[in-house]
Regions:
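Iron-sulfur cluster-binding cysteine motifs and their immediate structural context
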Residues: 1, 11-38, 213
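Cys/His-enriched microdomains
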Residues: 7-10, 16-20, 166, 201-205
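Iron-sulfur cluster-binding electron-transfer modules in prokaryotic oxidoreductases
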Residues: 28-262
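Active-site-adjacent structural elements in folded domains
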Residues: 1-7, 255, 259
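Short beta-alpha connecting loops at secondary-structure transitions
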Residues: 1-5, 17-20, 41-50
Length: 262
């Protein structure tokens, strides 16, 4: 019991990947998320709620901070973040490590009336820049690589107008911060509903964990609607069950390989 707070609650990845291996098919991740939500730190929850409200700013600050940190002596940055973590808490201030890259390029909208997909570039790829096999900076990160693949394969895409303010909500979901999660999921699903023309176009994300976050977000909202509405959706209510989420790797394998000349 004494060790469970750390080994059971604090360090669980809450991604549910253990469920397929569980002999009784239990999703321990969902349980841990609920327990974290019930025992959330109020200050941290408030901070993450504000972060959800101002995510466009937070996203840019994170990327620029990493770029700036790379130019300073490591002991200075590492020591500063350690002090800040002790004062504000581990959930509020991330720890800085020497092998972290510089910040990535900002996400930008992309319009195309003939789009075949809606591309959802993950904010993690704008916060963290790309690296090559030796750990050195590479201007081509996962987002840029997928865009290049689309261009080579002739796949038309669009990126939502307010993409800079959006996130898959995994940080809030995994930490159990329900208020921030609701703010972000509401923003993302409404934007994707509009960008996909009401679910006509598939959504493709360039980070696997973020694809999972988008899918969980969609399912949670559908479950909430099912509890509220017995006889179907009310008129004008978006039917988010029509949204289709795909990981970029799987989408490329299924829909782009035969269009590429290697």
């Amino acid at each position: 019991r004494k060790e469970y707070a750390y080994y059971g609650l604090a360090t669980c990845a809450v991604d549910g990947i253990c469920q397929p291996r569980c002999p009784v098919n239990i999703n321990a991740g969902a349980l841990i998320r609920r327990l974290r939500s019930e025992n959330q730190d109020k200050l941290a929850a408030t901070g993450w709620k504000i972060a959800a409200q101002q995510w466009g700013i937070m996203d840019k600050v994170a990327g620029k901070s990493l770029t700036m940190a790379k130019k300073l002596p490591f002991p200075v940055v590492h020591g500063t973040t350690n002090i800040a973590r002790k004062v504000m808490g581990d959930d509020m201030v991330p720890s800085y490590k020497k092998d972290l890259p510089v910040g990535g390029p900002a996400r930008k909208p992309h319009k195309d009336a003939t789009a075949e997909i809606v591309f959802f570039p993950a904010c993690v790829n704008s916060m963290f820049g790309g690296v090559d096999g030796d750990g050195k900076h590479d201007p081509i990160n996962a987002t840029q690589a997928f865009i290049r693949l689309c261009e080579r394969a002739g796949v038309k895409y669009r990126i939502p107008d307010n993409i800079g303010e959006m996130c898959c909500s995994t940080p809030w979901k995994s930490k159990g911060f329900t208020d921030g999660y609701s703010i972000m999921s509401d923003r993302v699903l409404k934007s994707l509903w509009e960008a996909t023309d009401g679910g006509r176009l598939p959504v493709v994300c360039d980070a696997s964990s973020c694809t999972e976050g988008l899918e969980v977000m969609r399912k949670k909202v559908i479950e909430a609607l099912e509890h509220k509405i017995v006889n179907g959706l009310t008129p004008g209510e978006p039917d988010f069950s029509r949204l289709r989420m795909y990981d970029a790797v799987q989408f490329a394998a299924d829909n782009m390989l035969d269009k590429l000349t290697v």
